[in-house]
């Protein structure tokens, strides 16, 4: 069955819609961390470096979780994994309202919410979407990653307003219950691939459209063969550096604003503005990645997220922070969104894309952990955020040579997972052959 003919649309669009909702709500706590810092300092008297360590801990604990989720998703499917992750996020958010000690914050946020809960959605959803769509992949991934930017737009000001007006306990009790319910319901709409429902990927609904001379019964490329090549590690390194650079900003820009005398809700709006404008870059850079490949995509995004940081050295008024938020957001989202598309171009759909993406997310996770902790610790040492900003700027520029060293891209139409040409018929660049999508 190629279509849900009764309704006249392909189930791939249901998967995309559900994935977007999950993407928004799964990131509620993680993407809003910056608005928690000042209330925690005021309520408990904790140091900013100690608080931001929870942000780092979430990504560090998430490293093995990301690897495990990628492996399990490739073998057993994603739905049950995401149901469990939704329960963790909902329960953890609920328990955030009951914390009284720093170690409790580390356990609930660092383990339950920010790492083990968030990891499943982060790794599995982008890979599932690449399996469901053959045509319009760049646009579809743009829609998906654009939705990721809506989470902070909604939840950063909501959390801050509720914390200031309803208190810590009531805020997290209510939001925890809502998150758990929504994540559980929408996870039920996700299926690992079109084959589960007897469908083809969107754009390959007719047998006549399938590439000739292919067979889905032929063996896929093994992960160990891919990991012997350097490009996976290079991509993971780029993701690490890029995430370290923008984690300093995302975890601390609200505190940077309040440190300069900006009111709390107004400062939270800076983070929401970054997220809102990043919707544009997440959408645009997904299309750029599909058309022009990783080299151009990652070079532009790293440069675009680094240069605006200079503005913050001179920011004292709210309008300057909002100007920064707009300029920074227009490129920062591009650093994250291209990797699933780049992987499909470089490795093909017969490769274990979930496992490959999980390796890159390890790079991202260590970068986010490092950046979040460094930003707070440098403030505690120096009493200002100048050194934190300098660290973000330097990290971004370090990633540029790595991005420029990636293979040049040559646009081709990727082959869907059910009908992909095996490695021996269309050699992967990782196995020494010329792959579609690459120019030597």
What residue spans do the PLM features occupy?
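Extracytoplasmic gate region of multi-pass secondary transporters
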Residues: 33-38, 224-287, 371
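Conserved MFS/SLC helix-loop-helix module at the cytosolic interface between two early adjacent transmembrane helices
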Residues: 64-103, 289, 295
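Hydrophobic core of transmembrane alpha-helices in multi-pass small-molecule transporters
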Residues: 92, 104-120, 320-334
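Cytoplasmic helix-loop-helix junction between adjacent transmembrane helices
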Residues: 109-146, 348
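Helix-loop-helix hairpin linking two adjacent transmembrane segments in secondary transporters
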Residues: 135, 144-197
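A late C-terminal transmembrane helix in Major Facilitator Superfamily
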Residues: 143, 152, 347-384
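Symmetry-related core transmembrane helices of the 12-TM Major Facilitator Superfamily/SLC fold
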Residues: 172-189, 387-405
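C-terminal transmembrane helical hairpin of 12-TM major facilitator-type secondary transporters
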Residues: 245-246, 266, 272-342
């Amino acid at each position: 069955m190629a279509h849900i003919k009764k309704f006249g649309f392909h189930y791939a669009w249901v998967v995309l819609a559900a994935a977007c909702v999950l993407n928004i709500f799964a990131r509620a706590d993680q993407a809003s961390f910056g608005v928690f810092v000042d209330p925690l300092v005021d309520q408990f008297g904790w140091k900013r470096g100690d608080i931001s360590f929870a942000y780092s801990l979430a990504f560090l604990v998430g490293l093995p979780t990301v690897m495990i989720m990628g492996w399990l998703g490739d073998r057993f499917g994603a739905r049950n994994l995401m149901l469990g992750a939704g329960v963790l996020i909902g329960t953890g958010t609920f328990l955030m309202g009951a914390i009284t000690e720093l170690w409790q914050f580390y356990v609930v946020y660092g383990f339950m919410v920010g790492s083990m809960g968030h990891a499943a959605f982060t790794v599995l959803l982008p890979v599932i979407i690449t399996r469901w769509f053959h045509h319009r992949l760049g646009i579809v991934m743009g829609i998906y990653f654009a939705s990721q930017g809506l989470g902070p737009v909604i939840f950063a000001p909501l959390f801050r307003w509720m914390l200031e007006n309803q208190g810590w306990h009531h805020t997290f009790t209510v939001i925890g219950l809502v998150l758990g319910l929504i994540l559980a319901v929408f996870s039920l709409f996700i299926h690992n691939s079109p084959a589960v429902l007897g469908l083809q990927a969107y754009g390959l609904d007719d047998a006549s459209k399938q590439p000739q001379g292919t067979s889905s019964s032929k063996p896929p490329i093994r992960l160990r063969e891919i990991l012997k090549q350097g490009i996976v590690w290079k991509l993971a390194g780029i993701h690490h550096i890029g995430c370290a650079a923008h984690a300093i900003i995302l975890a601390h820009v609200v505190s940077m604003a309040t440190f300069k005398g900006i009111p709390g809700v107004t400062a939270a709006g800076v983070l929401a503005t970054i997220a809102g404008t990043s919707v544009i870059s997440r959408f645009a850079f997904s299309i750029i990645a599909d058309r022009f490949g990783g080299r151009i995509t990652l070079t532009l995004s790293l440069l675009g997220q680094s240069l605006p940081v200079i503005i913050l050295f001179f920011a004292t008024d709210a309008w300057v922070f909002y100007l920064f938020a707009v300029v920074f957001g227009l490129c920062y989202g591009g650093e994250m969104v291209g990797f699933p598309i780049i992987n499909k171009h470089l490795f093909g759909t017969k490769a274990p894309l979930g496992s490959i993406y999980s390796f890159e997310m390890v790079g991202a996770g260590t970068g986010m952990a490092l950046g979040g902790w460094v930003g707070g610790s440098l403030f505690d040492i120096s009493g200002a955020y100048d050194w934190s900003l300098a660290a973000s700027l330097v990290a971004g520029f370090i990633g540029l040579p790595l991005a420029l060293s990636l293979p040049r891209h040559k646009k081709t139409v990727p082959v869907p997972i059910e009908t992909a040409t095996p490695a021996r018929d269309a050699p992967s660049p990782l196995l020494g052959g010329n792959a579609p999508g690459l120019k030597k």
